[in-house]
Amino acid sequence: MTAADQQVGIVLPVLNEQQALPDMFDVLRGLNPAPAEVLFVDGGSTDASCDLIREAGFRVLETATGRAVQINAGVAAVQAELVCILHADTAPPGDMVQVIRDTMADRRIALASFTPLIKGPDKTRWVTTFHNWIKTWYAPLITRPHLFIRGVRLLFGDHAMFFRRRQFLEIGGCTPSDAVMEEADLCVKFARLGKIRMVRRWVQTSDRRIAAWGPLKANWIYFKVGILWAVGARSRMAKDYPDIR
């Protein structure tokens, strides 16, 4: 792998994230080695998100609302060969860039991610963390068994997924019409090119949805939205996945 192939860009799709952004700025500044690029992609925030990003010295690209649209625009706009999609409420380890480089040095891997640890100010959500981990396997096994046999595993937004930019563009990126579960189709597409791997390193992701909905409701929503994706009821997914910001 050449030096150019080792460049890592971070794309952060955001919408009304002014509360989470200051902590994220600190996380990004603390990464060692530093990424070659950091690009925030704002989907029409009505709060101070864009102003905060610019004031902190980071680039922001403004697009239409929709995480799939934002991710596609962000990946197209960066130049780094390795790209990580990071949510504003998810904190990666300090050596994130090196982990990405080491993982993607294996050319057999097309798509990879970290392992999310769901945590709030007062507690770690171990049950939901376990559910989040195991559904990577059971979701494709139940909903797409023929693809599971071929090696498809489903990674999600809070996993901090990463991949090669040229391959993302080659497969057409995320399905633009997907408001949620945009990562699921991406996994199916990437599985045609190689292995999907979840690296055994934590990223700490906020429990704000669980805090707002309660653990039982949150896990039910996660399960239901997955089933809606599986049966092709895409128009209902966003309705059944309410925004908590």
Report each predicted region and the residues it spans.
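N-proximal low-complexity "stem/linker" segments adjacent to membrane-targeting elements
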Residues: 1-27
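Short, acidic, metal-binding catalytic loop of nucleotide-sugar glycosyltransferases
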Residues: 26-35
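A conserved acidic beta->alpha catalytic loop
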Residues: 42-50, 90
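Glycine-rich, basic loop-to-helix element that forms the pyrophosphate-binding segment
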Residues: 62-78
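Short aromatic/hydrophobic "clamp" motif used to bind/position activated sugar donors
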Residues: 83
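Conserved donor NDP-sugar-binding/catalytic core segment of glycosyltransferases
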Residues: 95-127
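Short, flexible, basic/aromatic active-site loop/helix in glycosyltransferases
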Residues: 114-121, 130-154
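Acidic donor-binding loop at a coil-to-helix junction in glycosyltransferase catalytic cores
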Residues: 179-186
